[in-house]
Curated annotation (Swiss-Prot):
This is DNA polymerase sliding clamp. It holds the Pfam family PCNA_N. It comes from the Archaea. Gene3D superfamilies: 3.70.10.10. Sliding clamp subunit that acts as a moving platform for DNA processing. Responsible for tethering the catalytic subunit of DNA polymerase and other proteins to DNA during high-speed replication. Homotrimer. The subunits circularize to form a toroid; DNA passes through its center. Replication factor C (RFC) is required to load the toroid on the DNA. GO terms for biological process: leading strand elongation; regulation of DNA replication. The gene is pcn. Belongs to the PCNA family. PROSITE patterns: PCNA_1. Keywords: DNA replication, DNA-binding. GO terms for molecular function: DNA binding; DNA polymerase processivity factor activity.
Length: 244
């Protein structure tokens, strides 16, 4: 038996708003400790990991481990129907992923499970030379500022500042943020702005983002719930000069 109840749908909505932009299908794995997924987009550019602990849920039961293969777009379409005051209940029944919203009315949706062979991707083990935290709102504003002039963004960090910049045909833009971390190196990488924008759709998961950065290395973006009950993280491959 699997059953998970949440009094607030926002964590699921914000998580799968990002995830559904990156991958079409996922396998959600459940056990007594909670729900999690690992997925890699078709172009092998973005890796995503989601972990929701059993303690996050108002009620959580998973007697035996389950593998739930679903279409992320269909799941997101259902989640968009949740009202702010609705309780969300997830369960399984005869090849269906059941999502029920309980509020002024009880609404039930059945998503057919996908019969696919799913190889769970494993992320590379990376040690980024620089790791630091930034307020999510500052990061999102920086991306929106850069978006004016270019479809790619340079992220760099040194002893004092985290910088985002772009050089476009019609103009340039740059944003810098005093990070306040103990960093003794200078690192810089170039990334697709569209790919970063997909990740930043998870803007309600956490108020703070942890960034791992290294020269010509994948970007690591980690969002941790302040309660410690959930984590959403991404790895984004860099755009090398030879890609231009």
């Amino acid at each position: 038996m699997f059953k998970a109840e949440l009094s607030d749908s926002s964590i699921l909505k914000t998580s799968f708003d990002a995830i559904s932009s990156i991958v079409d299908e996922v396998q959600i794995q459940t056990d007594s400790e909670g729900m999690r997924l690992d997925a890699l987009d078709r172009s092998h550019i973005t890796f995503v990991h989601l972990e929701l602990k059993a303690s996050l849920f108002d009620e959580y039961v998973c007697d035996v481990p389950e593998k739930i293969n679903i279409d992320t777009g269909e799941f997101m379409s259902v989640l968009k129907r949740a009202k702010s005051q609705d309780r969300v209940i997830m369960s399984l029944d005869e090849g269906n992923f059941i999502i029920t919203f309980e509020g002024d009315a009880t609404r039930t949706f059945k998503i057919r499970l996908i019969d696919i062979e799913y190889d769970n991707p494993t992320p590379p083990e990376l040690e980024h030379p620089a790791s630091f935290k930034v307020h999510f709102g500052i990061l999102k504003d920086a991306i929106n500022d850069i978006d004016i002039f270019s479809d790619k963004i340079a992220l760099q960090v040194d002893e004092d500042y985290f910088r985002a910049s772009a050089d476009g045909e019609f103009g340039d833009a740059s944003v810098k943020y005093l990070h306040g971390e103990n960093i003794n190196t200078q690192e810089k990488s170039l990334f697709s702005l569209d790919k970063i924008r997909e990740m930043l759709k998870a803007d309600k998961f956490s108020e703070e983002a942890e960034i791992g950065l290294g020269t010509d290395m994948p970007l690591k973006l980690t969002l941790n719930m302040v309660t410690g009950d959930g984590k959403l993280s991404f790895l984004l491959a860099p755009r090398l000069e030879s890609d231009e």
